């Protein structure tokens, strides 16, 4: 029994070693870009990407783990043969994708994903990116990876993983428990948000964050996303929709643009952008909402510029943020935030301020890895990020989503005393997100509506 438990751990090390080698190959293959990186950035590619490599390795352990749990019922020879064939098959698949990733990245600028299948039936389009020499070198490298790691596998398990001795029935629930615990590293930990591309992002440089990503994880995720990309908006014929779009695009609906801010002596104004989570005109009295829910906002409306015909671009936070910061309209079935290879082509709002020598910062009291938010804001080149990790841990545990907004605003206000001008500060709130567990109670009641009104 001990041999199988040790073997299970060694099998995890086997796949983790494979992915670390693949990452090293990627960095070496793209030496023209890697040579421009510092030692800390190269090390960060491996360190920050380790959580995704571990997650992917644990995915590959699920099926062998379940088969090993059946050792009291199945012969050791059968289990060892099954795991060996499973390993050979996966080595071929992962090695082919490794080579495809290396060959296509310099041309496409993205890690290998499901779109590669779009070109398998079109060799002419594929040959535009790859030469015959590339293909031959790729096949040679693929064969070397399979042969090298198959040799490594035989060295690790000369007699197989399954114990040839009699195994107690006690082993079955123990092994099943071990397989169940794999869910934790697969998910990426106990944080609110599961593992995503933001979990490994740590640099404003797109290449660095892409290199930290596990290519197999990225490929599997792209397969999952592709299932959700059917167009839900086919309400008219293609030619009619094009005509309507072009007609709308050619209009200038605002004949005279008002000057909202009058600058004094040519000074650049400081800018604070507050993104309010789950807000609505229904709680703001001057916009036709309830009275007395948000008295300070109501007061601001009487002495500010208020847009009374302003409509949401979407119904999810990630789609709102991509519209506010990236000027990108909402996609009904997905969000551009989860496609870094696409969002990297956007020029985000803070980048315009950076060009004017502003000091830019982003404040968010929650887990910034949630829904790929970190990767997105890093693309905007914010000079400073303040997140849940920058607050005492007890504050981060006060609510489900993280640090209550009050403490985040206190931190932002405190930073104003030392911020160099001009500055552009973005504050994204979380307390008004379900389940609305704010640390005070101004509006009584336990219904969903009461808790929401209390949170805003």
Where in this protein do the model-derived segments appear?
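Short alpha-helical "patches" and their helix-cap loops
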Residues: 78-82, 230-240, 337-341
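Transmembrane and membrane-interface helices of multi-pass
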Residues: 2-230
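The feature marks either
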Residues: 201, 205-260, 267, 302
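Alpha-helix initiation and N-capping motif
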Residues: 18, 113, 123, 213-216, ...
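Short, highly charged low-complexity linear segments
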Residues: 121-130, 157-161, 238-243, 337-342, ...
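Solvent-exposed soluble domains appended to multi-pass membrane proteins
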Residues: 245-456
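Long, well-ordered, tryptophan-enriched scaffold segments
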Residues: 135-141, 239-249, 377
């Amino acid at each position: 029994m001990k041999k199988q438990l040790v073997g299970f751990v060694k099998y995890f090390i086997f796949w983790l070693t494979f992915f670390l080698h693949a990452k090293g190959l990627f960095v070496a293959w793209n030496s023209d870009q890697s040579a421009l990186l510092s030692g800390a950035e190269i090390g960060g590619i491996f360190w920050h990407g380790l959580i995704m490599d571990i997650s992917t390795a644990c995915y590959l352990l699920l099926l062998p783990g379940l088969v090993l749990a059946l050792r009291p019922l199945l012969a050791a020879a059968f289990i060892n043969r099954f795991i060996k064939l499973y390993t050979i098959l996966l080595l071929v698949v992962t090695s082919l994708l490794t080579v495809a990733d290396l060959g296509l990245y310099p041309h496409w600028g993205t890690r290998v994903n499901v779109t590669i299948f779009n070109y398998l039936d079109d060799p002419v389009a594929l040959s535009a990116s790859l030469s015959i020499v590339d293909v031959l070198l790729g096949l040679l490298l693929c064969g070397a990876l399979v042969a090298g790691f198959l040799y490594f596998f035989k060295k690790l398990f000369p007699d197989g993983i399954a114990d040839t001795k009699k195994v107690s029935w006690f082993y079955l629930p123990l092994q099943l428990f071990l397989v169940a615990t794999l869910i934790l590293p697969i998910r990426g930990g106990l944080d609110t948000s599961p593992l995503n591309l933001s979990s490994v992002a740590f640099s404003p440089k797109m290449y660095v964050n892409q290199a930290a990503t596990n290519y197999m994880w990225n490929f599997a995720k792209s397969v999952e996303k592709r299932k959700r990309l059917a167009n839900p908006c086919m309400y008219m014929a293609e030619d009619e929709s094009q005509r309507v779009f072009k007609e709308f695009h050619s209009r200038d609906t605002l004949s005279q643009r008002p000057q909202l801010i009058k600058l004094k002596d040519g000074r650049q104004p400081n800018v604070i952008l507050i993104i309010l989570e789950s807000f609505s005109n229904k709680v703001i009295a001057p916009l036709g909402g309830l009275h007395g829910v948000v008295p300070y906002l109501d007061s601001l409306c009487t002495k500010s510029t208020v847009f009374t015909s302003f409509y949401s671009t979407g119904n999810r936070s990630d789609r709102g943020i991509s519209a506010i910061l990236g000027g990108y309209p909402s996609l009904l079935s997905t969000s551009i935030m989860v496609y870094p290879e696409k969002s990297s082509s956007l020029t985000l709002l803070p980048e315009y301020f950076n060009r004017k020598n502003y000091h830019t910062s982003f404040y968010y009291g929650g887990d910034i890895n949630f829904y790929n938010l970190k990767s997105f804001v890093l693309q905007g080149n914010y000079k400073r990020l303040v997140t849940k990790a920058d607050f005492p841990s007890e504050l981060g545990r006060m609510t489900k989503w993280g640090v209550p907004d009050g403490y985040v605003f206190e931190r932002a206000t405190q930073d104003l005393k030392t911020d160099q001008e001009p500055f552009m500060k973005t504050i994204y709130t979380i307390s008004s997100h379900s389940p609305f567990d704010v640390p005070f109670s101004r509006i009584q009641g336990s219904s969903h509506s009461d808790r929401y009104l209390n949170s805003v």
